[in-house]
Amino acid sequence: MSENCSHNCSSCGETCASRTMESFRVPLNPQSSVKKVIGVVSGKGGVGKSLVTSLMACKMRARNNRVGILDADITGPSIPKAFGIHGMVGVTADQLMLPRTTSTGIEILSSNLILEHETDPVIWRGPVVGGVIKQFWSEALWKDIDYMFVDMPPGTGDVPLTVFQTLPVDGIIIVSSPQELVGMIVGKAVQMAEMMKVPILGIVENMSYVLCPDCGKHINVFGDSHVDETGKKYHLPVLAKMPLNPEFAKEADAGMIETFAGDYLDGAADAVA
């Protein structure tokens, strides 16, 4: 750090080597309170990250916690649909966004809830997307939230960087699938988290197997799982192995994800708590 550093980061460039992680933090507004922030990430798309986010929120809500979901997948939001939430958010007299509340009391803020029509595409460049995420955090009324889950888009680009730098993330869950290729992709997410000094709570493997409805046998439709060796390689616990279950899609499509009562994520919920 330079001897002449004033610690006033607004007076220097973003590339200044003296900047600290804390200097990028965006504070909550004085009317909001969030105790713990958990990011749900994946190195690639299509592994069920939003499903895991939704089910984790439901699991922690079922344990009598106040739960919120900040949907940071700005260009591909799916959280409101899974919970049956439609329409736009409200605004307080102080011009704070009011997250929509699900049937069980989970608070949700998503780009789909600030659009006039939920099918309208979000065609924004990275800085605009990052600005919206910061607004979802600092310009919304999050009242007494025990656990905030942040559903992030796949990869290691602008949005994860924005979330890690500006939100006080307490830990992340990495979502993967059984294919061996995913092990390499998980490695990228692990290394990014380590570079950003964000704790990794563990790995959740989705689509791990199909449970035969007749004999109960586990069928590895995507081949043998490699999540255990991936976890061992990076010294991370495997928090859950979730099956490829048609009920997930059925209930999410119907906006009734909160009615699912499986125990697949009990271990992940324990790690978060």
Residue ranges and their predicted role:
Residues 34, 45, 71, 79, ...:
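Residue-level signature of catalytic and energy-coupling elements of molecular machines
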Residues 109, 152, 165, 271-272:
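Glycine-rich phosphate-binding loops of nucleotide-dependent enzymes
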